[in-house]
A protein has these predicted regions:
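N-terminal Rossmann-like NAD(P)+-binding domain of SDR-like oxidoreductases, especially those catalyzing
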Residues: 1-180, 304, 316, 320, ...
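C-terminal substrate-binding subdomain of Rossmann-fold SDR/epimerase-dehydratase oxidoreductases
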Residues: 3-4, 57, 102, 203-331
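Alpha-helix N-cap/helix-start and coil->helix boundary motif
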Residues: 28, 35-36, 60, 90, ...
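Flexible interhelical turns and helix-capping residues at alpha-helix boundaries
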Residues: 35, 78, 188, 238-241, ...
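Residue-level signal for the nucleotide or nucleotide-sugar donor/cofactor binding architecture
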Residues: 37, 87, 95-98, 148, ...
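NAD(P)-dependent short-chain dehydrogenase/reductase
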Residues: 127-134, 159-218, 223-235, 251-253, ...
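Short helix-coil transition/hinge motifs at the ends and kinks of transmembrane helices
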Residues: 129-141, 187, 240, 269-274
């Protein structure tokens, strides 16, 4: 049994990671300040004797705070909303960069063997031209085209993590997530994840909103496949001083209009009583036209590959969200 420390454990990805580790016999300590996470995401594991939770902010964690030693630190906490970071740049830097530095120091004091970091595929957002996709981990951002503030904070944190890990003998693995979706994703954001946004609008008898033409293409990965990705990363961790980056995606991409069609079809399959139609609004600034991850490195190094097709993943997500809505109405 290994001992893990997870930041952002009450978030969408963090709570799923905690559950995956616990199901595989691991011990987990998690923190969250509930700025983006929700208590309901961890209610089912709070009584697990192998799980301990503290309501804490990553910026307030003391390096030698008495939590004990850990085999792995998973740093997932961040201000992740692109437009929130644009409008609150000081806070984005404070949390995403300075907070990450604080957790690195914590990992060193906790004698952690490995530090895992939730990086972002938004670092590829300014790579122009369909011929340059899918993007590999070695592809560099276009220095002549500006990136969004969220991507910049993640890039800065990534550089510190690699350098700090090498200097202090901590192995580091960085995950560049694409669009992660599934049950318990955060639907309270100003602009929620597209699969959840479409689903909620249809459930509520409203018309889904698409920004721009709907022709932008995105790489989507279901949370169940991300769970197996994370555990493969842990089981295949390298020497203590090693530093690696891996793309976390499905390796394909889909037009937003196609996602809307698949969500609509999934709603029809469960007789959710939805109606068609789309509301088009002006395009959001500084958004990539294409995202598509080259996932051959994870396949080669870990033998990992996503199992769910986009249709299967959306069907499963819509069914689960419909079930959760029914349970909420019954309570």
């Amino acid at each position: 049994m290994a001992k893990h420390f997870i930041t952002g454990v009450a978030g969408f990805v963090g709570s799923n990671l905690a559950r995956t580790l616990l199901e595989n016999g691991e011990e987990v300590v998690g923190i969250d300040n509930f700025s983006c996470g929700f208590h309901k995401n961890i209610e089912d594991i709070l009584e697990d004797p192998s799980f301990t939770f503290y309501e804490k902010d990553i910026r307030d964690i003391e390096w030698d705070s008495g939590y004990g030693d850990f085999d792995a630190v998973w740093h997932l906490a961040a201000r992740g909303e692109l437009y929130y970071c644009r409008d609150h740049i000081d806070e984005a830097i404070d949390v995403n960069v300075k907070g990450s530095l604080n957790m690195l120091k914590f990992a060193a004091c906790a004698d952690a063997h490995h530090f895992y970091f939730s990086d972002t595929s938004a670092e590829y957002d300014n790579i122009i031209g369909e011929e340059n996709y899918p993007t590999a981990e070695t592809d560099a951002p276009n220095v002549n085209t500006p990136l969004g503030y969220y991507a910049i904070t993640k890039m800065a944190a990534s550089q510190f993590i690699r350098s700090y890990g090498i200097a202090n003998g901590i192995g580091t693995t960085l995950f560049r997530y694409t669009n992660i979706y599934g049950p318990s994703m955060n639907l309270k954001r100003d602009i929620p994840p597209v699969v959840g946004s479409f689903t909620n609008k249809l459930f509520d008898g409203e018309t889904p909103i698409i920004f721009g033409s709907g022709r932008k293409r995105r790489d989507f990965l279901h949370i169940d496949d991300l769970n197996s990705f994370h555990y493969a990363a842990f089981k295949n961790r390298q020497d203590k001083t090693d530093s690696q980056t891996y793309n976390a995606g499905c390796g394909e991409n889909y037009e937003i209009l196609e996602i809307r069609r698949l969500v609509y079809n999934a709603c029809m399959k469960i007789d959710a009583g939805v109606s068609g139609g789309v509301i088009y609004k002006p395009d959001q600034p500084n958004e990539a036209e294409i995202t598509q991850a080259d996932i051959s490195k994870a396949k080669s190094d870990w033998g990992w590959a996503p199992k769910l097709s986009i249709e299967e993943g959306i069907d499963r997500t819509v069914q689960n969200l419909w079930q959760l809505r029914g349970e909420s109405n019954d309570s």
